[in-house]
């Protein structure tokens, strides 16, 4: 499982011109599911995202300006967006190969479980719409982007 996380000032997801999910300051997390992923790896990924320290610590003078707080500590939102393209193999040729991505029906079920788990761990969770052609709007803060992997 891979997740591209971004520290954002704002992020939203729209489908057919209708906003389906939005957050203010927080983390926009694109989630890519692979063949070997399961509920346990999904839970590990959510736990990692929620505790990954990518926000500045301006409360402690000794840590001023250092990324030392996680999304929960700053009271930010979490926007989860399914994105199978994160599983692409790009090392050969000029076209991505998506054979590592989980089949859509299985991925939809696992992504729903991932979202459900996230909502049990944190209050401010929003999502896109699985399988839809989504328009994602974000104001990246920093920019700070990290590619997380869980096996």
Curated annotation (Swiss-Prot):
Can you say where in the cell this protein is located? Cytoplasm
TM ranges are: none
Alphabetized Pfam families for the sequence: Tyr_Deacylase (PF02580)
Q: Motif Gly-cisPro motif, important for rejection of L-amino acids — list its residue ranges.
A: 142-143
| Domains as described in the record | A Gly-cisPro motif from one monomer fits into the active site of the other monomer to allow specific chiral rejection of L-amino acids.
Please give the PANTHER family that the UniProt record associates with this protein.
Answer: D-AMINOACYL-TRNA DEACYLASE 1 (PTHR10472:SF5), D-TYROSYL-TRNA TYR DEACYLASE (PTHR10472)
Query: What name does this protein carry?
Result: D-aminoacyl-tRNA deacylase
Q: Which organism is it from?
A: Psychrobacter cryohalolentis (strain ATCC BAA-1226 / DSM 17306 / VKM B-2378 / K5)
């Amino acid at each position: 499982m891979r997740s591209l996380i971004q520290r954002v000032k704002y992020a939203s997801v729209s489908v057919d011109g209708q906003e389906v999910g939005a957050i203010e300051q927080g983390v926009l997390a694109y989630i890519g599911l692979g063949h070997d992923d399961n509920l346990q790896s999904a839970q590990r990924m959510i736990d990692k995202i929620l505790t990954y320290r990518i926000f500045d610590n301006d409360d402690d003078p000794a840590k001023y300006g250092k990324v030392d707080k996680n999304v929960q500590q700053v009271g930010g939102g979490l926007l989860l967006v399914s994105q199978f393209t994160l599983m692409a193999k790009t090392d050969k040729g000029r076209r991505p190969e998506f054979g590592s991505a989980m089949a859509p029906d299985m991925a939809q079920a696992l992504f729903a479980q991932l979202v459900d788990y996230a909502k049990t761990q944190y209050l401010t969770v929003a999502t896109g719409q699985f399988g839809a052609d989504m328009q994602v709007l974000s104001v990246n803060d920093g920019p700070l982007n990290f590619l997380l992997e869980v096996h």
